[in-house]
Amino acid sequence: MMPLLHLAGTLIMALFLSCLRPGSLNPCIEVLPNITYQCMDQNLSKIPHDIPYSTKNLDLSFNPLKILRSYSFTNFSQLQWLDLSRCEIETIEDKAWHGLNQLSTLVLTGNPIKSFSPGSFSGLTNLENLVAVETKMTSLEGFHIGQLISLKKLNVAHNLIHSFKLPEYFSNLTNLEHVDLSYNYIQTISVKDLQFLRENPQVNLSLDLSLNPIDSIQAQAFQGIRLHELTLRSNFNSSNVLKMCLQNMTGLHVHRLILGEFKNERNLESFDRSVMEGLCNVSIDEFRLTYINHFSDDIYNLNCLANISAMSFTGVHIKHIADVPRHFKWQSLSIIRCHLKPFPKLSLPFLKSWTLTTNREDISFGQLALPSLRYLDLSRNAMSFRGCCSYSDFGTNNLKYLDLSFNGVILMSANFMGLEELEYLDFQHSTLKKVTEFSVFLSLEKLLYLDISYTNTKIDFDGIFLGLISLNTLKMAGNSFKDNTLSNVFTNTTNLTFLDLSKCQLEQISRGVFDTLYRLQLLNMSHNNLLFLDPSHYKQLYSLRTLDCSFNRIETSKGILQHFPKSLAVFNLTNNSVACICEYQNFLQWVKDQKMFLVNVEQMKCASPIDMKASLVLDFTNSTCYIYKTIISVSVVSVLVVATVAFLIYHFYFHLILIAGCKKYSRGESIYDAFVIYSSQNEDWVRNELVKNLEEGVPRFQLCLHYRDFIPGVAIAANIIQEGFHKSRKVIVVVSRHFIQSRWCIFEYEIAQTWQFLSSRSGIIFIVLEKVEKSLLRQQVELYRLLSRNTYLEWEDNALGRHIFWRRLKKALLDGKALNPDETSEEEQEATTLT
């Protein structure tokens, strides 16, 4: 029974394994599909065979491979880079690298290889870089790499090598350029050690012997030897040993000699002129001195250094270098991380390049006299410039490169007169003063590169970049503009291809700012405060490839999104305040449609509304908007209908009452001859003049007056309509300044108009009590129009004027009045009297 159970278990396991896809058990990480794989520290005991044959880069470091057997890499014919660091490899069998014809870099660091057979490196026909650091190698003689005819760089640092002898097989390595033997145990250098170089003068080799405890160099050891570079750093335990060894390097021809110590490896107690005298018998083109503490200031007066082309001091405790003789033919001088004080006022007629950076002491710029200078780097010195920049500052007309970045305050007092050849100018992280007070760069028509980033500049002068007609790179991040608005400062810079406006606190962009930048390829607008994305600003940028608007406050777009240049390939809109609402539906849909060239579009998140905050922009759906639109449309229409009906009812309420009243009283007789509409300010005139002459005169008229005839306890509006209009034949409107300014009077007048329209008769009599300014009268358009087109009565406070006024008013009131016989005789008598 048990064998059957074992058989069943085996079959189930086999079935399970057969269902796994090929390569699913591969522990390696696919960095680039089919190109780069990382198998570091996966406890592999052999080379995995399920990695694609097309792999070019393979990291197998920190795996216990122990032995590299023959044909281990047959499946990797395309491999170019192989890292086998610390794989505990002790043995490399012949033909272990078979098939690696394309391999160019091999790293064997940290493997305790016991021995190398003559065929250990066979098959590596194109290997250019071999790293065998910390392999416990004791000699180059047993390191059989003579077959590596393409080898250019050999690194055997941190080993146990005691002899500097370069074996005979080096004669096969005709392409060898650099050998790193640093941190070994080489103590002596003899004549025979360099026989290979003496017999092969065509080899242009660089040797690094740093950190070897050299205590002697045999006389004539370097006689007739040519090297491209020789590095001797932290090799000598005293100045005397160094002095003796330098004297025995007589006859050496070296392009670049690097001498000194490391920052954390200091052995020499002093370094003076006598130590350097040994170099007088060495032919040197470039000399570099590094990390020397006790340095004699007169060392640069050594005449044997007069003819070198390049001098470099790095980390040297040098205090001043002002007395370099004028006849020195130095063409390049570098002073990096030194302790100069004060600023060196050099006068070297042959100097073309000068670098003074990261000085450890505070210094202020002083004028120079360097007529051949083309390259000047004074960055990272916290220097102050009391005036910049013109020919008088540097004493040259040939300057092409000027770096004044990471300094203190730079006062711009000139516009680079005499420096018209400048092509590169860097002020970043220095504080520029007066840079916007005039066209500072007007003379720099050949300038190609300008960096004024983080210079505390507020740009309020549109002519700041006048003259820069050749400029192709402009960096101005970290500054600000007037009113936080990008103004038209680029009109003259038509050749720009790179423009950085990040972190400029921009909120708006003026129209046409970029319209002349037809060649611009990269525009960085990130880390500003832009609220909208307006494609019209970028419409004329026909060559634009990259646009970065990330880290702004953009909610949506303005204008037509299709106006972006067709050349645009990379667009970054991440980290903005995108509003995922239906109002911006077109913009959100455009974001979805442009996924191909929007950077990290899948990470773009909504900032509002609250219920959508932190959700992905791509998750916003248009269908939601259609539902919302339907609900909102129905709701809005319903509200509008109800509001309109309510408004009409409210607005025409009294008119409706008037209509109803007209129907009710249409067949009844009028009680009053006229209903008087007037302002309370004119009540005295109504009582003393109008009532007295009409109700007590002949014929007599009955007037409806609100203070006398309105029924108490009834709403005023109801009294006006029912007692005033419905029971009166006519309406007298007393027009005055107070009348026009009274909203209640105007309301009564509007009801009177409706009454006149419904009664189909001319029943309104206008009395203009006083002169009213036309400007005031025009405020009531309808009243002004009626007074302009109809006859009205004007009150004149004189005998003749009164006589005519009352005669005309009574005549108007008699129109349509039914008179009894008594009233008729009285009327005739009154008429006779008036005649």
UniProtKB/Swiss-Prot annotation:
Alphabetized Pfam families for the sequence: LRR_8 (PF13855), TIR (PF01582)
Family from the record: Belongs to the Toll-like receptor family.
Name the record gives this protein: Toll-like receptor 4
Residue ranges of every copy of the TIR domain listed in the record: 670-813
Signal sequence annotation: 1-25
Origin species: Rattus norvegicus (Rat)
Predominant location: membrane
Residues that span the membrane, as ranges: 639-659
Glycosylation-annotated residues: 34, 43, 75, 172, 204, 237, 248, 281, 307, 492, 495, 524, 572, 575, 622
